[in-house]
Amino acid sequence: PAAYFYVADMLYRQFGDDSSIKERYPSMKRWVNHMTETKMKDYILVKDEYGDWCMPPESPELIHSEDPARKTNGEVLSTTVFYSILQLMEKFAQMNGLPADAEEYAALAIKIKDAYNKKFFNPGTAQYDNNTVTANLLSLRLGLVPDGYEDKVFANVVEKTEKDCKGHVSAGVLGIQHLMRGLTEYGGLELAYKIVTNDTYPSWGYMIKKGATTIW
């Protein structure tokens, strides 16, 4: 469902086409209200079934990881993404001339960010939840990290990727969307290059070596 909002915003940013934002705003608002009323508990979105889908398992013989430490908490994923949707809805409301809606979304986003950090952020280690790359990366790129902790959270992304994942792909379908962008934005260019050029498991190069014509 998040694609509904992201695509509308992408069309506007890339082409200046705001028709989707104008025409679809009422249905977007209904969906946000539905999620807030039925899937939120203490400002944490508890609706998530798939998690960071297809996080590379420990070996290519496995379909899914058997190690809980490699799995990102579904509430982390759903809450960070919902927070980013609220930021979009604040912008969409302003574009539609609805300042009251914009204020409502901004206020809700603040409450979610506060509750999220109280539940999942460890200020002593600058880690989110169980310190997966995806948990730290989404919190960072989607704007939930408390001021002053950004570099420390990013350092955890780098350390986890280099140490535990040996410089290989370290996220599933949700985290991977932010991995290359996050590394380049925060100065991890060499690590990004290493990940892209690896040809051992798990990596895109490994897929190519095995004859893949699409991403597994």
What are these regions (language model features)?
Residues 1-216:
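Active-site core of glycosidic bond-cleaving carbohydrate-active enzymes
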